[in-house]
Amino acid sequence: MILAGRASRSMTGWNERIALAEKLDAPVLSSIKLAAAFPTTHRLHPIPPFQGLPKSAAALIKSADVILALDWLDLAGTFKQAYGGEAIGAKVIHVSCDAHSHRGWSADYQGLPPADVYMLCETDAAVPLLLEACAKRTASVALPAKPALPPIPDAVSLRTVAVALEEATRGVRQRRH
């Protein structure tokens, strides 16, 4: 599975992240705390972006055999929410430059996540190399069904606004200035 965190805004990087997820047939999670790093309407993005880890996302993380964290914000906290005190059963590949900002005396790094492989680089440097090096895979875990929106929502939520905006702008091309 892929935790899509901080990434550049380049179309090349965007397309490479999609290609990697598709090649690995890996579900992708994203956080509402960060700018989009993966299309939330993609079939491999089964859970809407979140702030606190929902149970469905925790279950998906716990079922993964490999977790590729692409500069995920507070990876240690996410693992703590998903696994509690249990050992992490997946191999963890952590791509991040966070180590440059960690100062041990101030403990301003939240928590240090376990990693089987730590790649000290930005997401856009790692993804093309991973895309080239990885073999195509078929998912071993079924994706959870995307929750349907009620026909007329009782309240306005970020998700209902996002879905309405996506539906209203589907097929509209951005003008270049």
Where are the predicted features?
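Flexible, glycine/proline-enriched loop segments at strand-loop-helix junctions
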Residues: L3-R6, V117-Y118, L149-P153
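Active-site diphosphate/adenylate-binding microenvironment
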Residues: L143-H177
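Active-site glycine- and acidic-residue-rich loops that bind
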Residues: R6-W14, L73-A76, D154-T160
